[in-house]
Amino acid sequence: MARGTLSAALFGAGLLAAGSAGAAEPTQITMWSNWPDEPAKKEWVTARVRAFEAAQKQCTVKLSFIPKADIYTQAKSAVRTGQAPDVFYMEPDQPEFLAGGFLEPIDAYVDLSKLEDWAKPAWTQKGKVYGLPVEAYTVELYYNKDKVKAVGVEVPASAQLTQDGFRDLVRKGVAAGVTPVSQGVGDRPFPGGLLLFESLLRKLGTADYGRLLNGELSFKDPRVAETMTYVKELVDLGAYPKSFATLKLGESHYYFYQNPGALTFPDPSWFTGRAFAPAASGGMPDGFPLGIMQFPAMDGGQCPTCKTLAVAGSFVIYARGKNKDCAGALLASMATVDNGTKWMEQVSLQTGLKSDPSKIKSSHEDYFRELNARNKDVTYFFGTPLLYYRAKCAETYTQVMNNAFPAGLISVKDAAERMDAACLKS
């Protein structure tokens, strides 16, 4: 019997004993989840919690949906004072929680065979797994099929424009008065780097791109400089919205598919969390001509078929919590193939839980078909820049590559020097 299965069995026996003793009050645990403005994800989490409460009468859950930035702010203080929730939302790019000893390994509670093998390393340290990887994603380039065609650009059957072809798309969009690339960095530390770093991945290939993110390759490398120069040209042509610096992530979705509208939108595939909400709640209008193209192939690129795959929204257990049995049982109840299938069906997004694609029934089957096509025969690189960058390097990435460089406020040379100063290992 797997360790997680054994723990669940023992916990169940403990609950039975407590029940037979009578009069025992249920144990209430607290849970903080992200996604207050993403209905499908919110409904999925709520349903899993309610199912758990129905099955485990000795545990109840006080569930709160809180914006991610607020969770992080509150949790950073709460874990130190002993006031953190029993279970809370976390992403792998917040290593200080694990480094500080604030997270409990889930191995003793969860059957790890129910997690995708590629998702476990994101939460593994010293042989232990510390997070339940519910949300996974690839970085995609969404586009408005009608608008792109209207400005005179034909997307080939490969769904991948050349470097010159994407430059032409930007020029034609600007000439037609349509923003070529919807993007904003008003409330996130990463969107401004998506186009550049996906281009760098395709230019360098997985090995050298990994060296770049690990501080082993200079941003002054000629291939990196060439790619940065190309993206700087797109910026100078007017690729991004004039409101780039203040446009928030949710607003950039609306900007793309509602008002004023844009040709393309680089975004992780959790795009669907907002896009598939009702139009009145900020989602895509009915009949929106959504397409997915590959990021452009770089001239002389080592890996035009490369793509980023990553783990995002996960749930962790507070190591100093007093109700870890109930908290662990909750995560164990979530980690099933059926729940993974329901996530993909309801949210239209990848998951680190194992699932059965043959059982997925969705009103967004056309979207799934195109997403699967864009991810066929690709070479994945695991993790985004902020999964690798830490401390001063991460701060510099946010200041330079997320903000100043795509806003046209800094040169290629200066951006490379600042990144090397903060990130390049001696």
Name each model feature, range by range.
Residues 28-46, 388:
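Extracytoplasmic "Venus flytrap"
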Residues 168-172, 213-245, 295:
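Glycine-centered hinge/linker elements that transmit conformational signals in sensory
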Residues 130-133, 139, 165-216:
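Extracytoplasmic/periplasmic solute-binding protein
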Residues 25, 54-55, 151, 237, ...:
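Extracytoplasmic/periplasmic substrate-recognition and gating elements
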Residues 86, 113-148, 169, 179-180, ...:
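A structural signal for short loop-to-beta-strand junctions that line the ligand-binding cleft
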Residues 90-140, 167-169, 195, 287-295:
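Hinge/lid segment of periplasmic solute-binding proteins
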